[in-house]
Amino acid sequence: MSLHSLIFFSSSSSSLLFSFFFIFIFCFSLSDAEQNPEASILYSWLHSSSPTPSSLSLFNWNSIDNTPCNNWTFITCSSQGFITDIDIESVPLQLSLPKNLPAFRSLQKLTISGANLTGTLPESLGDCLGLKVLDLSSNGLVGDIPWSLSKLRNLETLILNSNQLTGKIPPDISKCSKLKSLILFDNLLTGSIPTELGKLSGLEVIRIGGNKEISGQIPSEIGDCSNLTVLGLAETSVSGNLPSSLGKLKKLETLSIYTTMISGEIPSDLGNCSELVDLFLYENSLSGSIPREIGQLTKLEQLFLWQNSLVGGIPEEIGNCSNLKMIDLSLNLLSGSIPSSIGRLSFLEEFMISDNKFSGSIPTTISNCSSLVQLQLDKNQISGLIPSELGTLTKLTLFFAWSNQLEGSIPPGLADCTDLQALDLSRNSLTGTIPSGLFMLRNLTKLLLISNSLSGFIPQEIGNCSSLVRLRLGFNRITGEIPSGIGSLKKINFLDFSSNRLHGKVPDEIGSCSELQMIDLSNNSLEGSLPNPVSSLSGLQVLDVSANQFSGKIPASLGRLVSLNKLILSKNLFSGSIPTSLGMCSGLQLLDLGSNELSGEIPSELGDIENLEIALNLSSNRLTGKIPSKIASLNKLSILDLSHNMLEGDLAPLANIENLVSLNISYNSFSGYLPDNKLFRQLSPQDLEGNKKLCSSTQDSCFLTYRKGNGLGDDGDASRTRKLRLTLALLITLTVVLMILGAVAVIRARRNIDNERDSELGETYKWQFTPFQKLNFSVDQIIRCLVEPNVIGKGCSGVVYRADVDNGEVIAVKKLWPAMVNGGHDEKTKNVRDSFSAEVKTLGTIRHKNIVRFLGCCWNRNTRLLMYDYMPNGSLGSLLHERRGSSLDWDLRYRILLGAAQGLAYLHHDCLPPIVHRDIKANNILIGLDFEPYIADFGLAKLVDEGDIGRCSNTVAGSYGYIAPEYGYSMKITEKSDVYSYGVVVLEVLTGKQPIDPTVPEGIHLVDWVRQNRGSLEVLDSTLRSRTEAEADEMMQVLGTALLCVNSSPDERPTMKDVAAMLKEIKQEREEYAKVDLLLKKSPPPTTTMQEECRKNEMMMIPAAAASSSKEMRREERLLKSNNTSFSASSLLYSSSSSIE
């Protein structure tokens, strides 16, 4: 073979060999792709549980097509065929994170958001070194943020918001040097904000808000994050001052630190944040003045500083913030006049300065704010005239200036504000007539002009304002007749013309106002008969025409008003008999027919009004006959006035109306004895005088015992009965004491045996341990702490121990009493639902900031243990009674009550199925280090599903003094039972007394004692009585909420969601329109609650004989005042002390 041929052959062989090698490598790679391990991991993960068919349908992943880079949804791959992005959003998977994430070697983006992920964040996440974006937001993840994330040096975005993550923010996160976004809001994180975050100079977004337990000061090092555009720390417990270093954040656009515990002054350095657009610092404890440097923020659009303690005035420089759209400075202590420079803010849409101390006049320059939509100036000291120039604000929808010192007339030009929806100028000194043009505003829903000195007629144009929902013109000097055009107000639900000088008849057209819920025409000079069309208003809840000159008969058709809860016809000239049809008004709570010319007998049908609980006033009429026996059915009634009539007969029907607190039967012709009960023995002579045949001088005693079904007995019978009762009481008491002593002895003996047995069986039977959190201790460490010196409490379900474990943690351990069973072990395993299984089942499914954190449980055959966070301040009960409440000022008590209400509302309304606690009491509300409340002891907790609610229980549910009354006769437990128990706790917190307290006269229940004292400030704990008037007002409102909770009828109690809402609003109460945004409610529905609108003088509501001094009445009115809630309007109607809504 020639050399040339040899060389050619050698060259060809090499090429052929290289080709074969390339084909082999390609085939190997293809085979590797077909056996893609990443695809197998994802497929196995997706099918590791049973996703819903609807969720699974969104995935086209299958085991046959093992090439995710070509076909699979939610997956993106690199050109080499490796997965780089997993992007799954809003798909309910209910899975934990894949276990083998480090196997995804090229993964750069992992987004699984809104997917109901469960479990914890695995440490292995830190091995996905290529990750740039990690978004696991809006899931159900628990546990700590793993420290291993600090190894992700390429990470730019970390989004873990809206989970249930606990623990601290890892300081080592600062090692992620490329991090731009750190978003952790709405979790359960604790601890302080790491100072190390200041090392992340590239950080653009920090959002940590909504973590209530994050505390400490805002680190000044945050100012070193020079690229920061968003800083969100709202709704946390950060405290201290705002660091001046925030002024170094030249790129900052949003500063959101509201609803925290920060204090001190607003640093003037914020004026250096030239890019700032949104400044949210409301609901804090900031003091000092608004810095003038705020005027340097020329890009600022939203300035919210409401509910702080700011003083001084609004700086004139604010007019330089030419882009401002919203200003809210309400609920501060600001003073001075409104600067005229406000008129330079041409983009301003909302200007709210309510509830301050501003004075001076409304500047006319404000009319230059041509974009203005809301103008709220209420509750200040502003004087002078309302500028007519306001009529040029054609976009204005809401104008509140009530409770000021304005004078002059209402400018007719306001009628040019064609978009106006709500106008409230109440409680000023306005004069003149009501401009007729206001009733030409087609969008006006609320017109309130209460308590001024307006005169003239009600404009005939009233019928043109068809959108009106609330019209309140009370307490003015308006004359003339009510226009018939009122019948065109088809949406009106609240009509108040009270305390004016109106005369003539009420037009029949009022019956066309089909949405009316309240009519108040009291204190006028109206005459004629009550128009029959009123009876067609099926939704009417309150009808008050008292103190007029109405005559004729009371229409029998009023009986058709089944929604009516207050009917007040007193101080008129009504004649004839009381219609028997009123007995059909089953919802009536107050019936006042006093001071008329009514005759005939009291109809027995009034006894059918089962909800009549406030008052029945029939005084000062010409009624005759006897008290019908059916009146005894009014067992809820509080006030009864039958005085100044011609009634006769005995008082037997009144003997068993158990809830009566006020009774006046003076100046009648009653005869016989007085029923021998507590009410009659406490009556004053004035309530009985004028009855010549009652308790005549020939009788030895005025009191006789009334026995149901047997009438009145004589005095000798009463004496013998009392002696017999005393003898029986002594015998029963002695028997009970002996039984208790015997039971204690037996229990102690059994407990000693059980302790010995547990000690022995602890070695024989294996312990099982189920943690619900990440725990660093063993069962052995817990067991050795279960000794008598460590006992910190005993309850109906077990003994609670303090356990100091080796890692320095302190936890609380409840050792449950053994289950009481009948039968063998198999029957016990199958049938018994003791407190252990109830607590584990309940606590394992709930997480809330005001419910004690359940750490885990462990058990063997004889011993069952539950582990919780330890609460260093003990229980609410111990703080109130063992330490005499000295450490609890009003603010702390309020916070505890609100937190407990929110926790209980979570159990009732946010758990599926709802959870009834069954043993709410002061000792089951634990107090944390910062006096935050935690609901504890679910030993009697019961899951309530649709088939179980209201079912009779076989065990006593609750603790003595806290148990709802219906349990005694029905054995039924519902959420409303918890509401009652919570109401008792509120009374306990306010009064400082236990439910059954030795200091309460005659040993009556706390609820009854508070009711008897009718809202007097004297019921408050002595340490609270010296508080400010504003705080006293809050306390009396909370007391009123408590009385709603302890209503004897479960159906009449509010829900815990309503209670929490009422309590929350009491602290920030701004009467009817506190923080209302009518931009979001263009046409409020007719069902809007009315309690905040009703400021009726209580003296006009109840019989004169039942009224006390005006000071006492003001206290009682404060008692039930509350703001907007979903609770029924009727329950709070006529309870506000305010005359303005």
UniProtKB/Swiss-Prot annotation:
**Which reaction is recorded as catalysed by this protein?**
L-seryl-[protein] + ATP = O-phospho-L-seryl-[protein] + ADP + H(+); L-threonyl-[protein] + ATP = O-phospho-L-threonyl-[protein] + ADP + H(+)
Question: In this entry, which stretches build a coiled coil?
Answer: none
Q: Name the phenotypic consequences of knocking out this gene.
A: Smaller root meristem size and fewer root meristematic cortex cells, associated with shorter roots and a slighty reduced sensitivity to RGF1. Quintuple mutants rgi1 rgi2 rgi3 rgi4 rgi5 display a consistent short primary root phenotype with a small size of meristem associated with a total insensitivity to RGF1 and undetectable levels of PLT1 and PLT2. The triple mutant missing RGI1, RGI2 and RGI3 is insensitive to externally applied RGF peptides (e.g.
Q: Does the keyword Lyase apply?
A: no
Positions of the record's site feature: Essential for autophosphorylation activity: 814
Q: Where is the Protein kinase domain?
A: 786-1074
PROSITE patterns with a match to the protein in the record:
PROTEIN_KINASE_ATP, PROTEIN_KINASE_DOM, PROTEIN_KINASE_ST
The entry's keywords: ATP-binding, Cell membrane, Disulfide bond, Glycoprotein, Host-virus interaction, Kinase, Leucine-rich repeat, Membrane, Nucleotide-binding, Phosphoprotein, Receptor, Repeat, Serine/threonine-protein kinase, Signal, Transferase, Transmembrane, Transmembrane helix, Ubl conjugation
Disulfide pairs? 69-77
* UniProt-reported outcome of changing residue 814 to E: Lost autophosphorylation
Localization, per the record, is: Cell membrane
Q: Which SUPFAM superfamilies match?
A: L domain-like, Protein kinase-like (PK-like)
UniProt keyword Hydrolase, yes or no: no
Instruction: List the catalytic residues.
Output: 919 (proton acceptor)
Question: One GO molecular function term?
Answer: peptide binding
Task: Identify the residues that bind ATP.
Answer: 792-800, 814
* EC numbers for this chain: 2.7.11.1
The family classification in the record reads: Belongs to the protein kinase superfamily. Ser/Thr protein kinase family.
Q: How does it assemble?
A: Interacts with beet curly top virus AL4/C4. Binds to RGF peptides such as RGF1, GLV5/CLEL1/RGF2, GLV7/CLEL3/RGF3, GLV3/RGF4, GLV10/CLEL7/RGF5 and RGF10/CLELN; these interactions trigger the formation of heterodimers with SERK1, SERK2 or BAK1/SERK3 via LRR regions. Interacts with UBP13.
Q: Please give the name of this protein.
A: LRR receptor-like serine/threonine-protein kinase RGI1
